[in-house]
């Protein structure tokens, strides 16, 4: 992904971890960029790229089998934050939803699609 999207930022960290020069790889046509993780997932699914960096959950959703996983050492912890907005028109419902996200039932759903608790 592009550097302005999270998956692109994680990819840059992975390349740096392996001491690979992104600019050199891009100039050589070895790497290409997607505007978001769904675009990269589609490129992999269609076979228009040899490999791509996507979230395991996106790979799972697209029936792709990851060949490797990035570690926290490579790119840090991937976190999906959630919050109730100050101006939320349905703040009480949003609070209830956030409370649900912290239940064992929700965790079972998350784990079923490849997420883990932080």
PLM feature spans:
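Exported/periplasmic ABC-transporter solute-binding proteins
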Residues: 1-118
């Amino acid at each position: 992904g592009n550097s302005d999207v999270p998956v692109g930022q994680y990819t840059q960290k992975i390349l740096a971890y392996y001491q690979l020069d992104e600019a050199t790889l891009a100039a050589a046509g070895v790497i290409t960029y997607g505007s978001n993780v769904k675009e990269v997932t589609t490129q992999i699914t269609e076979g228009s790229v040899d490999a791509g960096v996507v979230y395991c959950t996106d790979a799972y959703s697209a029936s792709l089998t990851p060949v490797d996983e990035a570690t926290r050492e490579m790119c840090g912890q991937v976190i999906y934050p959630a919050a109730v907005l100050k101006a939320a028109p349905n703040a009480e419902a949003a609070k209830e939803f956030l409370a649900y996200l912290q239940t064992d039932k929700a965790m079972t759903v998350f784990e079923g699609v490849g997420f883990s608790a932080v």
